[in-house]
Amino acid sequence: IGAGVGRDGTIAATKGKAKTLAELIXMYDS
């Protein structure tokens, strides 16, 4: 998930997905 982020023009889409997943994981992990 972290690899490649910020290198291609897909950073926006990747960051958006990563953020969503991170939030969901954080909620379940809490």
Curated annotation (Swiss-Prot):
Subcellular location: Periplasm
Source organism (scientific name): Desulfuromonas acetoxidans (Chloropseudomonas ethylica)
Protein's recorded name: Cytochrome c3, 50 kDa
Source species taxonomy: Bacteria, Pseudomonadati, Thermodesulfobacteriota, Desulfuromonadia, Desulfuromonadales
Heme listed as a keyword: yes
Single GO BP term: anaerobic respiration
Keywords of the record: Electron transport, Heme, Iron, Metal-binding, Periplasm, Sulfate respiration, Transport
Molecular function via GO: metal ion binding
A single GO cellular-component term on record: periplasmic space
Modification note: Binds 4 heme groups per subunit.
Keyword Iron: yes
Function as written in the Swiss-Prot or TrEMBL entry: Participates in sulfate respiration coupled with phosphorylation by transferring electrons from the enzyme dehydrogenase to ferredoxin.
Assembly and interaction partners: Monomer.
